[in-house]
């Protein structure tokens, strides 16, 4: 049976690295709906090559390697999820607002360039909610992950 939600166009979303880890490394229960949305195509996950490089680097952090090992989950499997589900975009122009954490700026820039929802738990990003809304970006902390769908 089809619902009105099924008929809606997919939502463009930018997922920061910690959200990606929640989806496929930590199996965060609060991220289940977002993971399902990505896997079923209800989310158009936008990312850049630099975001993939960051994910690959983070997957080598000792605390992440420990988690991957405990789950018998190769880092390549996480990167394969990225490659399978992401819609790769060129680097975006600088957004009108700068994040105090330079590592997060690329996520903000891409979300602003595509008027996409941005998913992050980073305090330096979350404090920019009102400014990002002025740019057409809905900022969703993990627990409200599908609120804009």
Please give the residue ranges for each predicted region.
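Alpha-helix capping/helix-boundary segments
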Residues: 19-20, 51, 124-125
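Short, flexible loop segments at the rims of nucleotide/cofactor-binding pockets, characterized by
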Residues: 21-24, 68, 93-100
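Residues that scaffold the ATP/ADP-binding catalytic core of kinase and kinase-like folds
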Residues: 23-24, 58, 67, 128-129, ...
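Active-site neighborhoods of divalent-metal-dependent phosphate/nucleic-acid chemistry enzymes
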Residues: 83-119, 124
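Acidic, PIN/NYN-like endoribonuclease modules and their adjacent C-terminal/linker elements
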Residues: 105-108, 115-117, 123-149
């Amino acid at each position: 049976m089809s619902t009105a939600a099924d008929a809606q166009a997919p939502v463009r979303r930018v997922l920061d690295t910690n959200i990606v880890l929640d989806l496929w490394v930590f199996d965060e229960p609060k991220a289940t709906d977002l993971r399902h949305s990505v896997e079923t195509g209800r989310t158009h996950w936008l990312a850049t090559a630099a975001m993939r490089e960051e994910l690959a680097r983070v997957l080598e952090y000792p605390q992440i390697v420990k988690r991957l090992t405990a789950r018998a989950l190769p880092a390549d499997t996480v990167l394969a999820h990225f490659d399978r589900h992401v819609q790769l975009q060129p680097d975006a122009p600088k957004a009108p607002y700068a994040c105090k954490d330079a590592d997060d700026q690329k996520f903000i820039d891409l979300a602003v360039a595509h008027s996409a929802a941005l998913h992050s738990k980073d305090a330096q990003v979350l404090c920019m909610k009102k400014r990002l809304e002025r740019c057409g970006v809905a900022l969703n902390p993990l627990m409200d992950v599908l609120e804009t769908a």
